[in-house]
Amino acid sequence: MGVVVAETSQNGDISLLSEKKFTVPQPPSIEEFSIVKPISRGAFGKVYLARRKNNNKLFAVKVVKKADMINKNMVQQVQAERDALALSKSPFIVHLYYSLQSANNIYLIMEYLIGGDVKSLLHIYGYFDEEMAVKYISEVALALDYLHRHGIIHRDLKPDNMLISNEGHIKLTDFGLSKVTLKRELSMMDILTTPSMAKPKRDYSRTPGQVLSLISSLGFNTPVGGRTQGSIAQQTEGMRGNASTPLLMKKKENSVKGNKLMISCPEAGLSSPSMPVKCLTPNLLKCRTPFTTSSTSSQSRICLSSLESECGMSPRWENCSQDAEAPPYLNSSRVKDCSSEQARSKKPMGSSASQNLKHLEFAFSPIVDRRTGKKAGFQDETGELSDTPLATLGAKGVIRKCLYDNNAQEKHKDLGKDDQGELEKLTISPDSPPWLANGSVAPIQFNDDEIIEKMGIKRNYDLVEKSPEQEVLQDKKTNTDYKRGCTITGYPVSQSTGLTMEINSLFLSELRSSTNNYASDRKSEDDYISAPRTHENLGSGNTIAKNLLCELDDNCERDGEANSNSGCEEGENQKESLNQDSESSSADMSVTENQIERELCQVDKSIKELSFEESPSESNEETTPENKGMAFMAENDALKREPNRSVLPETLHNVLASPAPTSAMAHPRRKPMVAFRSYNSPINGSNLSEPSRISMNSADKIHFSLGCTGSFPMAVTPAQKKVQGLTETPYRTPKTVRRGGLQAENERILGTPDYLAPELLLGKSHGPAVDWWALGVCLFEFLTGIPPFNDETPSQVFQNILNRDIPWPEEEETLSVNAQSAIEILLAIDQTKRAGLKDLKAHHLFHAIEWDDLQNLPMPFIPQPDDETDTTYFEARNNAQHLKVSGFSL
């Protein structure tokens, strides 16, 4: 904050006032806080004790790395956590003061609660007395009721996320997995008009700077300098916007004067692996002078906008450079003559000058149709950027191209392959760029055939808006050509979610078969029930840990080439089989899998890469548990993009056509799992640079995952009867075709294993009842010291939850009748019959609770810290979980 004087009306956001001093409200900077010590560490961030420099007030600062959130596909959850805390004003919910961010991190500035978390206190106590447990549960119940009334579901309720205030009261925190029904960004009115208590205290009022920080947008396109090494998802996330393709801009007026082609590219575009950044010297990067002679003629604009777009330069820098500051080689007479001659050129395309213009525009102009060599929409500049320049053209060759003589161009064009070695070397003038001094760079040959050949090898900028094989593999196409009509945003990398303990949904399918007595109302909610397996094999889903993004090396491409032809012989039979399977039940789709981790090596493109296939650099992304749930999704999408040919081996065909196992037939009402495959796919199967095929040896072992059907519609469709014309049609997502009931709105499994509600494990739609289930688990844990469904492995925990296997204490440790009854109504399998706040208030266990004055009641435990910076009460949980929080790395 600062005091400014408004002198003119042109100072941006400062209006004209009569020489009066006033303070402009603005959020603070993270530099205004100094770190005292680390407090704790969670699955997605670290919490530090920090002090405000101007008033020495203590805060708890949660630091979340943007790159980690991008890699774990948790960007939306960070936004939800900030929104949930900003909307909440309750004495039982931790108060959020500021939401700040830097280039790499997001900082949530919250109140510091010195009493630690309830999990640490529980480790010290062993278990709580009934009176103590009832008070804690009562305060948490009020907090949950407040959240639910405001459209917020916590979804990660556990003792670790309950903090103890200085007076001993409970406050909920860690809304990282919460669900907020607000379908838009926060506005100022959302925060200012948030209802709290009947008589709100001043503690819940927010300053203008706090409000501005809480409604600010969180940006996740980190700058190039802030990238962490070894993370590929950060690079691809920066390319999801406009980094890979220049911004398409239409002319609003037909007037030529006063309109320029603006090409935008964020700074994150520097992460593109195909961009010739290394070819640019610091001098060229500093000047960034466009080759522009006049804006009155569209043909005379031979600019560096495309090159700047490839190099990740922001358009806001374009006006910072002047011709006078350019180095000598950019102001040389040869460059100016080249530009002016190209601008004055009105000759036919056969002339040498026009050839120079044509070739130069191949490198620079984003408005050249490379299929015809003609410019589209040049008369009134109303055309779109239908094609973008090749990313494989180096900056050296581009600059050198401007220095070519017309005679050299003609001679270079007429030379054959045998005579190319006799090319005349370009005379280097004193004004030439410094990289031409050694003469080691040979001139780039602008041969149309070579350009087209390159387009078949790699998906470059030139191919973003059209089918990759339109010019290369036209003879192999049997169906309609396609043209991308709009930019399709990338699908998330993963459909499973990064959790407090990340949960793989693949091995949950075995557990669902054992819940017939408790889940009779789920006839169409589950996608697939696999054959039952033994307890030893319950965790076999964990074998699907092979990251699909790691299969983009040359060996896998060669393997894909070898396997791409293995299913061609029984093509028609497999088509008929797929069509028949679309009418079959889920039993006909039952396939077991034991070695899918080894077999998935043949998949060399992931779902993420199918969204923007010009990103070959994702081969090094580390394996994450979130990608386990994507195994069948990638295989399914590979089937979808395989046109007019069979990819399923004969063994898989036999399995699909054979009668189902007895266990699968026991569920005739299950919704069938059907795989989508389009026979008029725009991707040609033989093009190895495009999404490749699954190994023919591994397709008979595909494991159909339950959690892989949420985002991509699946259906078996017959081959097209008619061959469409040659008109280009846009890519379109297949229409959603479902059998049975609607799928759950969000099938991501959220939470910590011990506290997950059954409907989450069953893949059903869920609501606030999941929090009341978790509250019942917490009540049992408070009274016994151990969660009711705790076991050695997550799969066994899920088995206990679905079977509702509660180990009640016996003999002298037996719980009271009222306590056991309260736990029973909170842990009801049927979420419609699960208890809520109204039921708890009427229950005998809570008869002594004064609900309206609960925040003023004395609490059984009051923290006694040594000083205001004492974090001892957090250490018990950290030690129990073997967490070391001595590091200060952000």
UniProtKB/Swiss-Prot annotation:
Predominant localisation class? cytoplasm
Q: Which gene encodes it?
A: mastl
**Its EC number(s):** 2.7.11.1
What job does this protein perform? Serine/threonine kinase that plays a key role in M phase by acting as a regulator of mitosis entry and maintenance. Acts by promoting the inactivation of protein phosphatase 2A (PP2A) during M phase: does not directly inhibit PP2A but acts by mediating phosphorylation and subsequent activation of arpp19 and ensa at 'Ser-67', 2 phosphatase inhibitors that specifically inhibit the ppp2r2d (PR55-delta) subunit of PP2A. Inactivation of PP2A during M phase is essential to keep cyclin-B1-CDK1 activity high. Following DNA damage, it is also involved in checkpoint recovery by being inhibited.
Record keyword ATP-binding present: yes
Alphabetical UniProt keywords: ATP-binding, Cell cycle, Cell division, Cytoplasm, Cytoskeleton, Kinase, Mitosis, Nucleotide-binding, Nucleus, Phosphoprotein, Serine/threonine-protein kinase, Transferase
The protein depicted here goes by the name Serine/threonine-protein kinase greatwall
The cross-references to InterPro entries, in alphabetical order and at most eight, read:
AGC-kinase_C, Kinase-like_dom_sf, MASTL_STKc, Prot_kinase_dom, Ser/Thr_kinase_AS, Ser_Thr_kinase_AGC
The residues responsible for catalysis, as annotated, are 156
Where would I find the AGC-kinase C-terminal domain in this sequence?
847-890
Species: Xenopus tropicalis (Western clawed frog)
Entry's Gene Ontology BP terms: cell division; DNA damage response; G2/M transition of mitotic cell cycle; mitotic cell cycle
